[in-house]
């Protein structure tokens, strides 16, 4: 019987072979566990119109499942808000938390395929860090991912992408994401 080797994601290999050592030299870490890494990626798609038409949530579930390769969790309203005609328990969005190899593959596809496909893309804002090295940004449409068939899109949906790192400061997080290939704008 032959033992098949599991193929490691390209970005994970690059992180382990090059980026980790470069970050250790740059910030002078004494311990290997201090070197920042990406912990998880949370992709969220808000579907506010689903309060009026419950079928719209299915399109968001399908799109997010195609993009991330994982079944999304349907998020429901916690409180009723009369002005928005929203009742407690109505579906208002879908969310996926990616960890491990799926996370590395998603980040690789995001930086090498999806972000360059955005029209008039000038780079990501370097100011959207939260103070402890985590980065959040939004995409206006799901069509930038090649997994989504443009002809089968029922409506354009944006998404929020939250990259959670183990970095202690914004500078460490920025250095990590820049090394991973995130195209930040130069000030």
Swiss-Prot record:
Top-level taxon in the UniProt lineage: Bacteria
SUPFAM superfamilies: RL5-like (SSF55282)
Tagged with keyword Nucleus: no
Alphabetical keyword list: Ribonucleoprotein, Ribosomal protein, RNA-binding, rRNA-binding, tRNA-binding
Task of the protein: This is one of the proteins that bind and probably mediate the attachment of the 5S RNA into the large ribosomal subunit, where it forms part of the central protuberance. In the 70S ribosome it contacts protein S13 of the 30S subunit (bridge B1b), connecting the 2 subunits; this bridge is implicated in subunit movement. Contacts the P site tRNA; the 5S rRNA and some of its associated proteins might help stabilize positioning of ribosome-bound tRNAs.
NCBIfam families assigned to the protein according to its UniProt record, in alphabetical order: PRK00010.1
HAMAP family: Ribosomal_uL5_B (MF_01333_B)
UniProt protein name: Large ribosomal subunit protein uL5
Gene: rplE
């Amino acid at each position: 019987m032959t033992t098949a080797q599991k193929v490691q994601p390209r970005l994970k290999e690059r992180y382990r072979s090059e980026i980790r050592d470069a970050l250790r030299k740059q910030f002078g870490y004494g311990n290997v566990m201090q070197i920042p890494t990406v912990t998880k990626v949370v992709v969220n798609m808000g579907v506010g119109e689903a309060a009026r038409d419950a079928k719209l949530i299915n399109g968001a579930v399908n799109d997010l499942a195609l993009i991330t390769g994982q079944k999304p969790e349907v998020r429901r309203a916690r409180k009723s808000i009369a002005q928005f005609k929203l009742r407690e328990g109505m579906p208002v969005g879908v969310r996926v938390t990616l960890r491990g190899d799926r996370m590395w593959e998603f980040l690789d596809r995001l930086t090498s395929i999806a972000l360059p496909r955005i029209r008039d893309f000038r780079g990501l804002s370097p100011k959207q860090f939260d103070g402890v090295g985590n980065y959040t940004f939004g995409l206006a449409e799901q069509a930038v991912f090649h997994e989504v068939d443009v002809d089968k899109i029922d409506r354009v949906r944006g998404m929020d992408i939250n990259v959670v790192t183990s970095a202690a400061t914004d500078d460490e997080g920025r250095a990590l994401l820049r090394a991973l290939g995130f195209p930040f704008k130069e000030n």
